[in-house]
């Protein structure tokens, strides 16, 4: 009797599972054999982009997997990426509904993770016209230049005392200060409810949870729900979200104080004005959840990615003294020896710096997997049938190491971009640090300016050396992170003022 009852209880679970595993019509991409219930999850390590890369060496550039019962197709070449992001952009431009992204974006009320539709189109339009326009980029120039001067001042203090600089902390503080001033109107050098250590803790904790695996997203029926609660995953997600949400509420409350400045030019101020004026675009109305969703996008994507890119660039420059010497010589010859301050006008003069940044993006994309997409209909890509509701993963880490795209792909050679039309703006599919198609990052211009200005300052005013007794071969290149990939071991260098 008990066996019969168990069978009845488990029957719905197996029916759902069996239905999901029924073969699709047409030719699916190749891939490893999946196991019942867990699919191919047992073949994936902590570093998802590296696991995909390794599997693609065996199964090819278009590969079919199952995350539990969810079908996933991984694309690992520029040709495949172009078909997804250009040829079939419309059919693949929505996002999968995952529990972590839904939570941290206030039920997908943001721009990055929202499902494709009218609300997303209106939010995207708002972002391009009001939040990240070229006019806004110019208006906030003074903030970026002030923070870069402060970065130079702090590093100068270390140079004068001949002490190591933890570039993770220095560059995180630089990017976080800029992003929080232009987005939140908060100068954390003067803020009374949070400091920079707290900001860093919030960003890292939130990104870790945002990129974490929730069983409820991939396992059938109530099984995933139960495992998430037993394992503590559900509790961890909600605790991290509560801390982030509390921080956002502090920022909003600060804007709503009656004695607050009349300057509403920051992103929070602009969106609060829209909420208070009850303005509508057609049937679309901006709400507090939309505001917090955008805050989440900007805070989590804008702060860490820029710092990570600068750290990887400085790491590669330290490992390649020839490139470092060539870059610093060009910078100092073009800008002159006695410059007291770097401005954004100087960025157009330093061509080799741009090549170094592009080569850094190729080898160390801040997000080695683009944000996942989902097919909205059956679609044929690279000769394979991809069913509706399939998760799409584009592995930019693999594309950056594809020998069919790049000569000596594992070598750091900025000169490969000399006289090359390839850039980072989403039209060249061998280099996609900001994504491509309809879902390309709206903050791309701001992000690039922050990175270029930060690197130009630390490379113009300072020479850099390894700590005493450390050799280039000792530099640790291990990665860490899930959502964005940072250097695991901090890069600590000795700055020397260049006169």
From Swiss-Prot:
Heme binds at residue 441. InterPro entries: Cyt_P450 (IPR001128), Cyt_P450_CS (IPR017972), Cyt_P450_E_grp-I (IPR002401), Cyt_P450_sf (IPR036396), Cytochrome_P450_71 (IPR050193). The gene is CYP71B21. Gene3D superfamilies: Cytochrome P450. PROSITE patterns: CYTOCHROME_P450. Its EC number is 1.14.-.-. It comes from the Eukaryota. Keywords: Heme, Iron, Membrane, Metal-binding, Monooxygenase, Oxidoreductase, Transmembrane, Transmembrane helix. Its cofactor is heme. It is a single-pass membrane protein. Pfam families: p450 (PF00067). Belongs to the cytochrome P450 family. The keyword Iron applies. This is Cytochrome P450 71B21. It is an enzyme of class 1 (oxidoreductase). The chain crosses the membrane at residues 3-23. One of its GO terms (molecular function) is monooxygenase activity. Its main location: membrane. It is found in: Membrane. GO terms for cellular component: membrane. The keyword Zinc-finger does not apply. It comes from Arabidopsis thaliana.
